[in-house]
């Protein structure tokens, strides 16, 4: 449910001319969500909405009236806890708008930056998009490239290769 709500807010922000200002301000607030005290203040029903607004305003040196109105809207609808999802969805929509996609390469060993760049260049050509890859270590002997936003997944494992070789050899015999 929160993802649907976050998607609507992010879509509205993405259509604005000052999307980058909103995004930067939301990132500031999003970074505060790791603090338990901050979350307690945001989620508390005992703290008045005006005090919450003052508290959130204290995070910013330069006041943006549009962003303040957005925060008031979130406060009035008790949706401040949706800020992390809004930021995540906004990042996704910004990347889609700018034709930038983030993917993950799962491998048993850490890949060098050179290998990651080489994979990025090849995927950039294939999808005609700007692909950024991150490497995550997995326990499998396989290598897997996942581009969730594009619905693309490529997997290569030694077991699968051995099985295909065995099948091929058995067909020949």
UniProtKB/Swiss-Prot annotation:
Ordered alphabetically, the record's keywords are: ATP synthesis, Cell inner membrane, Cell membrane, CF(1), Hydrogen ion transport, Ion transport, Membrane, Transport
Q: Extract the Pfam families matched here.
A: OSCP
Q: How does it sit in the membrane?
A: Peripheral membrane protein
Transmembrane ranges? none
- GO molecular function of the protein, one example? proton-transporting ATP synthase activity, rotational mechanism
Q: Cellular component terms, GO, for this chain's entry?
A: plasma membrane; proton-transporting ATP synthase complex
Q: Which InterPro entries match?
A: ATP_synth_OSCP/delta_N_sf, ATPase_OSCP/dsu
Q: Which Gene3D superfamilies match?
A: N-terminal domain of the delta subunit of the F1F0-ATP synthase
Q: What is its main location?
A: membrane
Similarity-based family: Belongs to the ATPase delta chain family.
The subunit field of the Swiss-Prot or TrEMBL record says: F-type ATPases have 2 components, F(1) - the catalytic core - and F(0) - the membrane proton channel. F(1) has five subunits: alpha(3), beta(3), gamma(1), delta(1), epsilon(1). F(0) has three main subunits: a(1), b(2) and c(10-14). The alpha and beta chains form an alternating ring which encloses part of the gamma chain. F(1) is attached to F(0) by a central stalk formed by the gamma and epsilon chains, while a peripheral stalk is formed by the delta and b chains.
User: So what does this one do?
Assistant: F(1)F(0) ATP synthase produces ATP from ADP in the presence of a proton or sodium gradient. F-type ATPases consist of two structural domains, F(1) containing the extramembraneous catalytic core and F(0) containing the membrane proton channel, linked together by a central stalk and a peripheral stalk. During catalysis, ATP synthesis in the catalytic domain of F(1) is coupled via a rotary mechanism of the central stalk subunits to proton translocation.
The protein depicted here goes by the name ATP synthase subunit delta
Name the source organism.
Answer: Campylobacter jejuni subsp. jejuni serotype O:2 (strain ATCC 700819 / NCTC 11168)
Protein encoded by which gene:
atpH
